Amino acid sequence: AKEEKENREGIGDTVWEDLLKECNVKKYPAGSRKQAYKDQKRSYQVFAKVSGQSYEEFIGALGQTDEDIQSSADDQVKARMTAKTIAIKEGLTLSDADYERFLLAFLEPEEEEDKTLKAMEKRYIEEQSCYPRDDMLIELVKEYLGKNSKMK
């Protein structure tokens, strides 16, 4: 059962990635692009600090430029827009239980870490993005795609 679940998750991820390649965004909401860029940059700054490097050293070591970070931020906005569209069309709603489940799975908190929803949300916002619910909706859509795609 666990193996089948992991296989379905992998299928959901694959279908999601293929789907995103086919999606074209006509116009990005300006505020969303700016916030996604700030979130992406902050995330890199957190990792840089943890690794004892400056932000510039860290992204340089990854072979990334500021333009790459903007492109990655645009991809995140596209993913959120796509997930919201699929959720509306398919009647999917992110329940509080699913939200918490996806958030915990994403963050993989340490044993001694505070695992309350409020603490996990705070950590996600500090380390990842200001849009934890939107990002966990992506996980719900991936799960849905994995469960509902036809295996070849």
Question: What is each of the regions a protein language model found here?
Answer:
Residues 1-152:
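Extended, charged alpha-helical "arm"/coiled-coil substrate-binding scaffolds
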